[in-house]
Amino acid sequence: MTALKNDRFLRALLREPVDTTPVWMMRQAGRYLPEYRETRAQAGDFLSLCKNTEFACEVTLQPLRRYDLDAAILFSDILTIPDALGLGLYFETGEGPKFKKTIRTEQDVLNLPNFNAKSDLDYVMNAVTTIHSALGGQVPLIGFSGSPWTLATYMVEGGSSKDFRYTKHMMYSQPEVLHALLDRLAVAVIDYLNAQIDAGAQAVQIFDSWGGALAHREYTEFSLNYMRKIVAGLQREKDGRRIPVILFTKGGGQWLEPMIATGADAIGLDWTTPLNVARKTVAGRVALQGNLDPAVLYGSAASIEKSVKAMLDDAYANGETTGYIANLGHGITQWVDPSQPKIFVDTVHEYSAKYLGS
């Protein structure tokens, strides 16, 4: 086991003292970086970029060369599981992910093949192993998966959606079919994340990107219950170290209490939930991660610094000095000037000394 030179991200997830606030950015490896665009051009297309071990490793490491980040996150796609289940993932320019097949009936669910993460997504595991080795203990590596609900929306809709018409039609007219699909996906996600942990991931995040599109009762029934099942099925310790689990539901700030009850170590927040309110609600029971509006990075240096300091003031307003990781409230956008995230990251580290005494 390689000793970590910087473990403050993991310590913060476990609500242990840190010398400065750890920070990373969702989608930190992405199109806003010119070196990423160059590597993607070499790969030929996005899926080839994901499926080539050397390219996936390279783009994972790129933001760490620019910014003083406290964690790396595996570069992959959220839809690897549906692709491995034979739905035929492809991308059209300007239109996002699409599937050649959709899941609309009970028979469609029954026809899904068996799934084994280590064999069906071996390219992901190879990437995790390679990245872990390349990091050399510099910072921890985060593995991830989409939540069952989020994966199901893409599988039922056949791609991205603004209103989730087919998925919600299934939810209200054939709930048993949707539950059957979600159960299959929960089992697959458990296998997938455990395989990533075996390959070297030191923390994992479940991205429930579309959970916020659900009504209160439906969120519990069709999203949260399956994330709870996943958390219960995950390997929580490896090589004598706890493997923290982060849940992130975009638009889910109103569901903090039931999210805490899943057994996750941390909850990610988007920018619509005040951090000071969330900290008071969770009362030290879990760590919190977030939640700068990614659009803040369009602003001037002074504007970014002001927003970051306000976020940190909120995070530490209640006197707690543990259990907080700075991040964006959603993924960084492709239009951000690559010089701007450095202001965000450096301000987090420098200003948090005011509260952490480092």
Swiss-Prot record:
Q: Which Gene3D superfamilies would you find in this protein's record?
A: 3.20.20.210
Q: Which residues bind substrate?
A: 27-31, 77, 154, 209, 330
**Pathway given in the UniProt record:** Porphyrin-containing compound metabolism; protoporphyrin-IX biosynthesis; coproporphyrinogen-III from 5-aminolevulinate: step 4/4
The signal sequence is: none
Query: Can you state which reaction this protein catalyses?
Result: uroporphyrinogen III + 4 H(+) = coproporphyrinogen III + 4 CO2
List its EC numbers.
4.1.1.37
- A GO cellular-component term linked to this record: cytosol
Q: Does the keyword Transmembrane helix apply?
A: no
Per UniProt, the enzyme's principal EC class comes to lyase
Query: Can you cite a GO biological process for this protein?
Result: protoporphyrinogen IX biosynthetic process from glutamate
Identify the PANTHER family for this entry. Answer: METHYLTETRAHYDROFOLATE:HOMOCYSTEINE METHYLTRANSFERASE RELATED (PTHR21091), UROPORPHYRINOGEN DECARBOXYLASE (PTHR21091:SF169)
**What family does the entry list?**
Belongs to the uroporphyrinogen decarboxylase family.
Fetch the HAMAP family from UniProt.
Answer: URO_D
Q: Which NCBIfam families match?
A: hemE
Q: What is this protein called?
A: Uroporphyrinogen decarboxylase
Gene label: hemE
